[in-house]
């Protein structure tokens, strides 16, 4: 699983960023309201969410933020989208 990425931001909007690492682009869903600029170098902690029909990456600025996200996921009825919105 992907746990951490270090690369350059290729694209950014309010829902996700594209991070290029060794010429491979990763779409990473982010906390709403975060501002990232194209061309900036980024270190981002990743939660990898795998299901039968999808493979999604969620990105966080710190290990503590990632840990909080994982704790929110342990609450019954809270999925990745809800947990991300709560942050």
Task: Kindly give the residue locations of the regions a language model identified.
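Long, highly charged, low-complexity intrinsically disordered interaction regions
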Residues: 2-6, 10-87
């Amino acid at each position: 699983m992907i746990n951490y990425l270090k690369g350059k931001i290729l694209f950014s909007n309010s829902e996700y960023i594209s991070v290029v690492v060794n010429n491979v682009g990763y779409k990473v869903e982010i906390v709403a309201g975060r501002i990232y600029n194209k061309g900036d170098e980024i270190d981002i902690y990743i939660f990898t969410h795998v299901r039968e029909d999808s493979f999604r990456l969620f990105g966080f600025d710190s290990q503590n933020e990632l840990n909080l996200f994982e704790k929110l996921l342990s609450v019954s009825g809270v999925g990745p989208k809800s947990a991300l919105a709560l942050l």
